[in-house]
């Protein structure tokens, strides 16, 4: 989508007092730190929820640390932006291949970053090697398959699947999870997942590791894991642990 269209959506949503969120990227810039800069600028002074900030700090343009610090700086100077980040190394993306090319630019980027060709054979090898996992949901639990079983499942679905790569660097996850404003509030308002779609719901597991490390205390963990998200959604009876 062209950025001017996104700007119009943001303006209209704010006029209507509607919540608006953006998984950044446009026809001009991808889902990376450049796309993040673009989204912040497009919002102007309007409210905008920019989803999963850590996803734009994977070292595609600069290095992971510099990208995370830039994202934090932009959020500090634009309090109109609501944001969250997840704590898992896994991303979520489509693994569909058409005409020997993955249809998702995110998948293409992941394959290249991990040393695989962005082709049918490259995707197949990434799954076989365990660099990518194919999401299998049996109605009870979602899990990632790799190796021979993953390839067989992927091919049985004619590649029409989703899955994950381990492409979220620890440094950007850590920096964004713990960054604070001068008033002590968090730069990234909440921890997040995809609501169970992908097996990366590690808010408790990895969040408590931040507490154990000393980067957060238990009260701060509860604020990021529950309270801020509940407040943002207007859930008055939620937000405690």
Question: Language-model segments: which ranges?
Answer:
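His/Asp/Glu-enriched, well-ordered alpha-helical/loop segment
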Residues: 171-241
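Histidine/acidic residue-rich metal-binding segments in metalloenzymes
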Residues: 1-159, 166-187
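Short, surface-exposed alpha-helical recognition segments that flank or form part
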Residues: 164-167, 217
